Amino acid sequence: MANAKVAISIVTYNSKHIFKVLENLKQEFGHDPQFRFVIFDNNSTDDYQNRLKEYQDIADITFYHENNGFGFGHNYNLLHASEKYFLVFNPDIILVRDDLLKMIEILDRDETISLLVPKVLNADGTTQHLIRDRVSVFDYFLRFVPFQIVKKMFAGRLASYECRDLPDDRNVEIRIGSGCFMLLRGKDFKDVGGFDDRYFMYFEDYDLCIELKKRNKRIVYTPFSNVTHYYERGAHKNSNLFKIFMKSMYKYFNKWGWKWF
């Protein structure tokens, strides 16, 4: 859509929920000219790509010849886009149109906000605590350690790390939001060069937030909009994803300094 206001960017790789997600987007948005959907496929299987082609009536789809990761795909979709706002959108998110419209209205009203994130829910309606106030090695140890007695000993620290005390009655400035759903000013995304695509997956969203903060840009959480996220916690279950997570964590701390506690 040449005159769209929002570019909605989705990066896929054999994504489990994508077709349910795309059906939801068709139902919610139809061919609304305010929104342009751009999908970047990271060399999924032939069968998957053939199914994805069925949605070329609602989205511009790039089928790439190799998998260079999450940040690379979103940069490909967005760094040359002309829309005012960019929406980084996971292929496992269910969105109601009115929730996005409320977020756009917030950015329209307050030009000091660079990045806006909503409340993220599980399929059962409970909250996913994905916002972070800090990033430290010890906090990641606590998240991954399998012993509940250790988690209980540091329950207060984990609650603080996961920002479990965020208000439900007002928007609030935060330090780090989740890349599963980020509404950004296009200019600010371009000014920082988009995502650092040296991260294949994981930590590129944290890195983007730190880059924005370094430039005194505001990142805000709104509890008045919500999305449903079919969160897989892949790094907790899959050894290959855990290795990717650890590599990205190493890159992050090498770039921003090692914070142990």
Label each region the model flagged.
Residues 17, 39-49:
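A conserved acidic beta->alpha catalytic loop
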Residues 86:
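Short aromatic/hydrophobic "clamp" motif used to bind/position activated sugar donors
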Residues 166-167, 175-194, 198-226:
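A short, conserved alpha-helix in the catalytic core of glycosyltransferases
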Residues 135-174:
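Short, flexible, basic/aromatic active-site loop/helix in glycosyltransferases
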Residues 64-81:
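Glycine-rich, basic loop-to-helix element that forms the pyrophosphate-binding segment
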